[in-house]
Every structure is written in C-alpha cells, then in structure tokens.
Amino acid sequence: VSLTDLSNRPQNLSRGITLVIAAAFSISLQDLVIKLYSTQLTLWQIFALRGVLMLPLLYAVAWCRGVHRNVLRLALQRWVMLRSLFLASTFLAFYAALPFLNLSTVGAANYVAPIFVTLLSAYVIVEPVGPRGWFAVLIGFLGVVMLLQPGTDAFSYWAILPLIGATFYALAHITTRVKCHDVPLSAVALSLNLVMMAAGILGSLVITAFPPTDVLTQSYPYIFGKWGSLGVAEWQILFLLACLSLAIYMLLAGAYQAAPPSNVATFEYSYLIFVVIWDYLFFALLPNALSIFGMVLIVSAGLMVLRKQR
C-alpha cells in the first residue's frame, strides 16, 4: 500500500491516536531496556543481533501482506537504502547517548526533528515555510538551549548526539516524502533492518581490527568494548528488542494508515510522558524546571509545524 493512497482510505482518528500512543509507549520501553542493559551488551552487538532476530519476523510480515516475492528488491533500491542510512545514523546517535543521559533529555532533543524538517524543506526541496514556520524554528531553538543548558554544570556533550540524530531523522523524512512515498512499508522496514544490522557487524569488526585504548574501553564499554557474553537472559532481551521493534513498525504503520498524519504525529509526543515516568521509576531522576520548560517549547514548536502542515 503506498502512502499516496492513504487519503482514499476511511479515516479513523481514535484508532490512529490509540495506535500511535501504543507505538510511543513501545519506543519508550525499548529505549528503557537498552539503557538498562547497556552495561552488559554493546551498542554494535545490539544492532547486529537484534537485526538477525528481526529478519524472519519481517519476512513473515511481508508474506502476510503478499509482498514477500519483491520485498528484498524493493528494500535494496537506491533511495530506500539512503533513507535507511539516514535513519540508522539517527538511531546510532540516539542510542550511543542513552547510557550517559536521562531518557527525557535524549527524547526531547530527538524531537527537534520537525524543526529541522522545516529548515530542510525551505532549502533542500524549496517548500514555502512562512512566518509561523520560522517562528516555530526560533521557539524550538530556545527550547533546545533551555533543555541542554550549555555553559552550566548541567550541560553534557553527549546531548549533542541526539541533535545530530534529529538532523539525520529530518533528512530521512525529506527523502521519504520526495523519493520513497510509494514504497511498501514491509520493504522500508526490511531495508532499515538490513542497514542497522550491517552497521552493528561493521562496527564490531572495526573495534576488533583496531582495538581502542584501554582508557576508552574502560570508560565507554558500551561503545568501544568487546561483545558481552550471551546467556539465556541476554538472548531473551535481544528477542524482546526485536519484537518491540517489529511492534513499533506495525503500530506506526497502522496509525498513519488510519488517520491523517498531522493528527497522528501530534500524539507521538506522548513518548516524553512515558520516558519521564521511566526516569523516575528506574533511575530516581526528574528533569529540573528549566529542562521542563525547554521540553514544552520543543513540543510547542513541533506542534506549530504540524499545525502548519494541515
């Protein structure tokens, strides 16, 4: 089913909202699991092995949708692979920062993506932005400054990574809109999984061939360490992550098929509520007043962009 056909589908707003909130919850749960197990599994190990476990699951979905015969060919198309490369870079930046920041900070920084989409739309595909769009960019920038608090003790250079990830996410969004809007969802998901799995394998090989210094390995084992040992518990976690990834893909696809994207995307911000709860329950962390205000500004800017697109 192409995204261009979605306007002809019956619209079910309540179903779309329910599915996207379930997707946001699943994403927050996946991020929590990765953060909790970042001391036992490396980033590259998670990418590689989760990707392997997801392959049969993705093929099963493609088979159920009747696109299994052409799914690999479609997944390997040039523009689809470029989109997947952008998204894989997003996730690499996002997950690399997870052990060093609270979930709410990482999540809020990542939600700057709609603002970057506005900027890229103006200069890359020459779409009109208008005063409201530029005002949203300004509000979002102020929100980022308040969230990250540069120049204070609260600032962490790791917080720059989610912003880099948001930039790649915006590039992926633009690529989807311009070049990949008619690609079946199963092929898009398979392409992303293949690229992320390849990134995990390549990263692991590079670390093996060119071992980092002991200081780097001991300070940042999640990024520069060797693969952790895999027992039954670790395989269960990896399988859980694979299932969560598949659930997220299915829920998001269903949400955007059920209702207008501008309505659905508004409720993606429920993710921030979930990660604040996880931060408090699992790490006894709460954002300070300035960070909360920054999150509010970022969400407001994103909603302004979405409202403009309606």
Model-found features: residue ranges?
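Helix-helix packing/entry segments at the starts of transmembrane helices
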Residues: 49, 106-112, 179-195, 246-280
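Hydrophobic transmembrane alpha-helices of multi-pass small-molecule transport proteins
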Residues: 132-149, 290-309
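Transmembrane alpha-helical segments that form core, pore/gating elements
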Residues: 35, 58, 154-215, 224, ...
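Transmembrane alpha-helices of multi-pass small-molecule transport proteins
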Residues: 40-89, 168-175, 192-208
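C-terminal transmembrane-helix exit sites in multi-pass transporters
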Residues: 113-138, 273-292
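Glycine-/small-residue-enriched transmembrane alpha-helix faces in small-molecule transporters
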Residues: 2-45, 154-178
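Hydrophobic/aromatic residues within transmembrane alpha-helices
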Residues: 37, 46, 50, 97, ...
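Loop-to-transmembrane-helix transition segments
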Residues: 15-22, 69-93, 157-163, 214-247
